[in-house]
Curated annotation (Swiss-Prot):
PROSITE patterns linked: GASTRIN
Free-text function comment from the UniProt entry: Potent stimulus of gastric acid, but not of pancreatic secretion.
GO aspect biological process, one term: digestion
Organism: Gallus gallus (Chicken)
GO molecular function ontology, one term from the record: hormone activity
The name this protein goes by in its record: Gastrin/cholecystokinin-like peptide
Propeptide: 21-38, 97-105
Family statement: Belongs to the gastrin/cholecystokinin family.
Keyword Nuclease: no
GO cellular component, one term: extracellular region
Signal peptide: 1-20
Length: 105
């Protein structure tokens, strides 16, 4: 019993010593190219000019994504076709009630 406790303490001390050391850097320094779009090494917040440049660069893309009519929320015919193929006997009650209302009109 004492041997197991002693080995456990030695093992935990060795693991703690290995985990506390800083990671060694690889020789040659694997340099990742920094992206001009995402800079996380700024010492201070971006200036007003930089904010305006980022906004003017990304705002059209955001508007294009938001105005896209083929979104998941509005439904997709391909998804409905797959659903009908894999679940032929399952009835969506919301869809059934809208179909019944359309048939009654």
């Amino acid at each position: 019993m004492k041997t197991k406790v002693f080995l456990g303490l030695i093992l935990s001390a060795a693991v703690t010593a290995c985990l506390c050391r800083p990671a060694a850097k690889a020789p040659g320094g694997s340099h990742r190219p920094t992206s001009s779009l995402a800079r996380r090494d700024w010492p201070e917040p971006p200036s007003q000019e930089q904010q305006q440049r980022f906004i003017s660069r990304f705002l059209p893309h955001v508007f294009a994504e938001l105005s896209d009519r083929k979104g998941f929320v509005q439904g997709n015919g391909a998804v409905e076709a797959l659903h009908d193929h894999f679940y032929p006997d399952w009835m969506d009650f919301g869809r059934r009630s809208t179909e019944d209302a359309a048939d009654a009109a």
